[in-house]
Regions:
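Acidic/histidine-enriched alpha-helical segments
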Residues: 65, 121-145, 231-241
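Active-site glycine-rich loop that binds ribose-phosphate moieties when present
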Residues: 181-191
Length: 252
């Protein structure tokens, strides 16, 4: 059986990539959000962790884990990575195929609803995100950044890129991000999240036994309160000439 990916754009200017198939025992649903590095770099580093630990409906990790158990042990993850002068925030959930459930209910559909709610309905109000949870997320994010030095290969690659791109946004150093992470407030995190929803480039990848129409319907419902979206235009800085060789040695 041939598997054919289908790419479309919803009325909310969200990219949708669907690969509908019943060949697998699991479904993988992934939200990718592209945002510019710069003003909210530290906030995005925190958001990538914060968003997969709670939501408005499941306002604690215990409640969220309980919901994941109800979805037959669905696996949830969040990450952030650099792509040029942009950050890619990725939220992903993996669940069993609907044909394997005992009661015949749609685990895939429910998992997609949960994933979308984590992005569009986090545990925040008009005053900002929860100060208590934010404190925990800042600590976890800081520990993750500081811990990279223990992976010498990753640390060396990071330092090389920071040195090569010292005069570019892409060269934003871990120390600069770490310093700003500790200054993140509930209000600044809320501002970054609002920008992400309104102006981020969002793509949903849905692989499994779920249709394009079902995905579009759930996307429409999830983003109904967001308003008109205006995704930003990414800009890439090209360096046309090679500069002098720079050597850097650090003793650890």
């Amino acid at each position: 059986m041939e598997i054919t990916p289908k790419l479309s754009v919803t009325e909310d200017k969200i990219r949708l990539l669907t690969v509908k198939t019943d060949m697998f025992k699991t479904a993988c649903l992934t939200l990718n959000v592209l945002v510019p590095m710069g003003e909210y770099a530290a906030e995005y580093a925190v958001l990538s962790s914060y968003l997969v630990h709670s939501s408005k409906k499941y306002d604690s990790l215990i409640k969220l884990n309980s919901r994941l158990e109800e979805l037959y042990g669905a696996l949830l993850s969040g990450s952030i990575s650099r792509h040029g002068e942009n950050y890619r925030i990725q939220l992903s959930i993996t669940c069993i195929d609907d044909s394997l459930t005992f009661d015949g209910k749609s685990v895939t559909g429910a998992s997609l609803e949960l994933l979308l709610s984590l992005l569009t309905k986090p545990s925040a109000d008009e005053n900002g995100f929860s100060p208590e949870q934010l404190s925990t997320e800042i600590r976890l994010t800081a520990e993750d950044i500081e811990g990279e030095i223990n992976d010498k290969r990753s640390y060396a690659m990071t330092r090389m890129l920071e040195t090569m791109c010292a005069d570019e946004i892409y060269g934003l150093t871990k120390n600069e991000i770490l310093e700003n992470v500790k200054k993140v407030t509930p209000q600044s995190l809320l501002a970054a999240w609002k920008f992400m929803l309104k102006n981020g480039i969002i793509q949903l990848n849905a692989i499994g036994n779920i249709s394009e129409d079902d995905c579009k319907k759930k996307l429409r419902e999830a983003f109904s309160d967001v308003g008109e979206r205006t995704p930003y235009e990414p800009e890439t800085v090209f360096v046309e000439e090679a500069e002098d060789l720079t050597e850097l040695t650090e003793e650890l």
